[in-house]
Amino acid sequence: MRYCGSKARFMKDLAPILTKHLDGTNTFVDAFMGGANVISYIAYPKKIGIELNKYVFALWKEIWVNSRIGVTPERWIPETITRKQYDFIKNGYINNDDLLSLWYNDWEIGYVGTCCSFGGAWFNGYAAYNKKKKEDHIKEARN
C-alpha cells in the first residue's frame, strides 16, 4: 500500500535497529502500522501491528482474512472507484454520517481513504489518472 509517511525507503537501515533485541521469545510490535511496510519487511514469526484508524485497521483485517482463505484482491477489491464515489465516501466520513456505514463497510472506507487518495494520505484528494506519467493510481492500489 502506498501510504503517507511510509518508512519503506528506510527499511534497509531501520530493520537491523528494530530487530536487534528480537531473540525468538519476544514479539515485534509495529506501533504505527499505516501501510504495513515495516511489519511486512521484518522476517520474524511473532509480530503485532497496531493501527489507530479503525478504517485502515479494517482494511488490513480484510486483507488478512481473505489471504488466509485464498481469496485474491482482484476478487474482492473494487476494480475502480470513481471521483463521485470517492467524494461521497469522503464527505460521509468528514460529516460523520451514520448512513455511510449502510452503504460501505469499514474496510471499504479505509481502502478509499488511503489507497484511492493522492499520495496515500487519508482523504487527501482523489488519486486520478495521471496522463503525463500514464499512471492509474486506483488500478495500482488494487494490485
Residue ranges and their predicted role:
Residues 1-33, 37-38, 42:
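S-adenosyl-L-methionine
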Residues 45-143:
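Class I S-adenosyl-L-methionine-dependent methyltransferase module
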